[in-house]
Amino acid sequence: MTACCSELSKGSSGNQPSGIGTMCHEVSHALGLPDEYDTNYTALGMSYWSLMDSGNYCDNGKTPCGLTAYERDLLGWRPLTVLERSTTVRLRPLEAGGVGYKVVNEANPDEYYVLENRQHVGWDNGLVKLGHGMLVVHVDYDETAWKNNMLNTNATHQRMSFIPANNRYVCLLYTSDAADDLIGV
């Protein structure tokens, strides 16, 4: 039997339950998703862009972010569309029925990029302080890392992380640079 409850959020209004974010994160583990944060707490990982990292804390856990295109694919809910040649596609928001696109490294099929559109609608409404637009996620799949829940434990070799549009990995929290992360490629 597994039990899960909300965490307390310590803030100016006192100790309040954080909302459903942590429960959503833990249920997602039961469905088969790994942690995408650095379980050693030395690297960035996916930050607030993933429920399996800090996204469960969006809006104090009351509106955790939606699942990424990668996570939806991993669960078998919405497959990624592989882009194999130069083409033009329209990225509709995931929360409005859009799909994610996968661009594979021809030299290493376990390394690829996932492109998705994140907007402030549905579950992604909690991302309002972080900007919106195209999210580019770099994946360097390693079966052992995924099976052992160690995706991002090596700060110099992240197995799954977002690529900031401004090329600065400083956006761990809601900072003034946060909105720059998704605009453009």
Question: Regions from the language model: what does each represent?
Answer:
Residues 143-170:
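Acidic Ser/Thr/Pro-rich low-complexity disordered segments
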Residues 1-129, 140-142:
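Extracellular hydrolytic enzyme modules, especially secreted metalloproteases
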Residues 5-8, 160, 174:
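Intrinsically disordered, low-complexity segments enriched in Ser/Pro/Gly/Ala and basic residues
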Residues 174-181:
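Conserved small/polar residues in nucleotide/adenosyl-binding loops
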Residues 132-138:
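Beta-strand-rich binding/interaction modules
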Residues 27-36, 159-164, 171:
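Extended polysaccharide-engagement surfaces of secreted carbohydrate-active enzymes
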Residues 130-132, 153:
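General N-terminal targeting signals
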